Amino acid sequence: MTRYRSRANGRLVAALALGTAALTTLSACGAAPEEDTSSAATATSAADLGGLKELVAAAEKEGTLNAIALPPDWANYGEVIKAFEARYKVKVSVENPDASSSDEISAVKSRKGQKRAPDVLDLGIAFARSGAAEKLFAPYKVEAWDSIPDSQKEKDGLWFNDYGGYVSIGCDAARIKTCPETFADLLKPEYKGKVALNGNPTKAGSAFGGVYAASLANKGSFGDIQPGIDFFGKLKKSGNFIPVESTPATVEKGETPISIDWDYLNAGYADQFKGKGVDWKVAVPSDGVYAQYYSQAINKEAPHPAAARLWMEFLYSAEGQNLWLKGYARPVLLPSMTTEGTADKSFVTKLPAVEGTPTFPTSEELDKANADLAENWDKAVS
């Protein structure tokens, strides 16, 4: 079973009305592509190439899209890729599916000018912002640009949010008599040796979100993540928190029967484990409601610039957004699609229930939280 990647740090309408917001270095050999892609490489919209039809033709001429860090079981990316390949004559090559956002940025830098450089990126919001500041991305506005809330995109199209989710608590009811539903519940002695995060919060976005949510549940704030760090320190001292990165494999084996992760990943577990002896339940803790989006960006020096832009158009079409929705992720266009009647209601009704309305940290608050985690996390849980 494929592991859910621990996406590095970066982001929903009661069914979602939100719109306000907030490897190691890879190396490879290979020459830059020979074909003339200058027109596509400078296109800031499909209109710059004459329209979507012309963009499709240019992308199919390239024939390849280089992607990185897209596990098939993360937000339904496996089906997204299959649908894209079925619609267009473009083969999607995904390298290192379990890579983090930092690995993606490293690949952009280390493979500059090479055929194997990533064309497109799916990043934690902090990395999207820093990558834009480093001038690594190409500006591009998809046809659905105006439907993306201003707070969910960089004004020139250097990055734009794609899908998001809430921090949730997943629990194997086949192994746990009473599943926890709040962060406060996790401190109960009955959960000794059973609570895990999906990764290290200093590197992984889902784990980072878990600590942020725990902070909000313990009188912290976006400007003060320390209560969340202290919470996990207390959880570790009690023996409840275990230093094991939760994955589908560890869940199935019973090694991590309680996992703090994005709701779309935990909800995906529930589907995957049906008939396998795992009764996976998902709860979004009411005492620590925290939501986060990931972001799309195009490598400024993408070896397949037309395919990269066509990929973005597909992701932000109703088909692409509904495929993410099918994977329990909340697409950024869901509010407008709900209004237009293009959101698949059968998928919307399956989203985990949420109480309260989430808010989002500022860039400065995210930077401070990351710095505080880097300085204090290891000390708290060692």
What spans do the regions from the language model cover?
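A ligand-binding cleft/hinge motif common to bilobed small-molecule-binding domains
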Residues: A128-S130, E252, I258-V278
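Periplasmic-binding protein-like
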Residues: G164-S168, I229-K234, N240, G275-K300
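Mature extracytoplasmic/periplasmic domains
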Residues: Y290, Y294, I298-P358
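Bacterial lipoprotein signal-peptidase II cleavage site
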Residues: L26-S39
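Short, polar/charged alpha-helical segment
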Residues: G51-T64, L70-K91
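Extracytoplasmic ligand-binding site segments that recognize negatively charged/polar headgroups
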Residues: N66-I81, V94-K109, K115-E255
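Extracellular/periplasmic bilobal clamshell ligand-binding domains
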Residues: E340-S382
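Sec-dependent bacterial lipoprotein signal peptides
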Residues: M1-S27
